[in-house]
Each structure stands twice: as C-alpha cells, then as structure tokens.
C-alpha cells in the first residue's frame, strides 16, 4: 500500500536541483531527498548506504553542480540523479533507498510503500 508522507510545491525544485523534505510524524527523524534531473523527478530516504548517516543536513550542499549529482557531505560519495546509484565514493555500486514520487497539479507528492 502506498501512503503519502509529504508534499511540496513543484516550483520549489528547479531542473538540476535537489531538496530535502521533512517527513512529518516520523519517530526516526528521517528526511527525504527530492531531485529534479533533466529526465525525471526522483525521491529517496536521506541516508547514505555507506554508513547510514544523512547524506546532508543542509540542502545547499546536497547537489554537486559540477558533477550534476547528489553528494554525501561526509565522504563525498556521489549518486546518479535518476537511479540513486553511487558512481563514485566508498559505497560505489550501492543505491539510495527510493521513495515513490509523483507530480500533480503544481505539487510534488512523496510516498512510502507499506505492506
């Protein structure tokens, strides 16, 4: 079952940008990352597969403009914006945990899948 966990205005993320989104009512303090690449909109849990820490706690450091990649501020692992696969860094080949995301009528909706 897919349950909406957050929503933000579509205008809050331009192409080739990433943003952090609070997930309300979550006891683990998790946040989501939303990325708009040139090809698609993607969302992931803000947790590095290398050591489980948040990739970043300040959205202005989340997107590496030179590489067009999401970047972990701790060990500089970089992740492909459409797939979430780490293509350079200590967790090379590992993937961020994806979240279903949809864009409808000026809003980005982020979901969590539950059994």
Describe the role of every protein-language-model region:
Residues 91-92:
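Functionally engaged cysteine thiol sites
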Residues 1-63, 80-81, 95-115:
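N-terminal pre-ligand scaffold of iron-sulfur
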Residues 56-88:
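Mid-chain, well-packed structural core segment of small domains
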